[in-house]
Amino acid sequence: MFRNQYDNDVTVWSPQGRIHQIEYAMEAVKQGSATVGLKSKTHAVLVALKRAQSELAAHQKKILHVDNHIGISIAGLTADARLLCNFMRQECLDSRFVFDRPLPVSRLVSLIGSKTQIPTQRYGRRPYGVGLLIAGYDDMGPHIFQTCPSANYFDCRAMSIGARSQSARTYLERHMSEFMECNLNELVKHGLRALRETLPAEQDLTTKNVSIGIVGKDLEFTIYDDDDVSPFLEGLEERPQRKAQPTQPADEPAEKADEPMEH
């Protein structure tokens, strides 16, 4: 994308009917590390890939706790996500204090849509540069919602956002018919397999770079990090690309592996 006379402010329309500042914010989501959300009849699961800014830094948190029945995973600007997460927590607290009941997931997503729409229509403001996957469980069952910097939000059976997320979405589309009948362990494994598709061929999922969030019937939202992720990774089969590569004798050069597709 290149600068032009129609991208100076979010209130300026281009002749093609586009708002470039919003499109730039959507690009920020694509730069964030990938995250996957999917649901069955009883549970909703978030799986996220964590990044470290440098070898000296700890991995950033990608899954955040909102309420006992809701959690989010993020892709994009972490600072913007932190602000939206605090807003969501406050709304959930208000619901419990005023009405003595958990806030319905769809109502919370609607409030987030209204809040993120305001900067897209006011001079001198910029859109939030973060996309959210919201997992929750209420009287209507498990939910996975996606929110965008454009203030649109979508109710999904499964979704992936972030860098190279198209590979994960392809996996989800291919196996979507299996999710509703899955037990919790199988659902998490599907999420891990989809997330693994976003990695280059030479990398794999580890306890350091994966975070898992689970919520469901009779199960409050729980985040699994570091060693807590091990039981889920142990049951995961090896990547098909690695299985297909036989060990080459020392005197025979190994064939060059296919380059991972860029998305």
UniProtKB/Swiss-Prot annotation:
Glycans are attached at S110. The keyword Metal-binding does not apply. InterPro entries: Ntn_hydrolases_N, Proteasome_alpha, Proteasome_alpha-type, Proteasome_alpha1, Proteasome_asu_N, Proteasome_sua/b. There is a cross-link at K115, K208 (Glycyl lysine isopeptide (Lys-Gly) (interchain with G-Cter in ubiquitin)). SUPFAM superfamilies: N-terminal nucleophile aminohydrolases (Ntn hydrolases). The modification Phosphoserine is found at S110, S177. The 26S proteasome consists of a 20S proteasome core and two 19S regulatory subunits. The 20S proteasome core is a barrel-shaped complex made of 28 subunits that are arranged in four stacked rings. The two outer rings are each formed by seven alpha subunits, and the two inner rings are formed by seven beta subunits. The proteolytic activity is exerted by three beta-subunits PSMB5, PSMB6 and PSMB7. Interacts with NOTCH3. Interacts with ZFAND1. Component of the 20S core proteasome complex involved in the proteolytic degradation of most intracellular proteins. This complex plays numerous essential roles within the cell by associating with different regulatory particles. Associated with two 19S regulatory particles, forms the 26S proteasome and thus participates in the ATP-dependent degradation of ubiquitinated proteins. Belongs to the peptidase T1A family. This is Proteasome subunit alpha type-1. The gene is PSMA1.
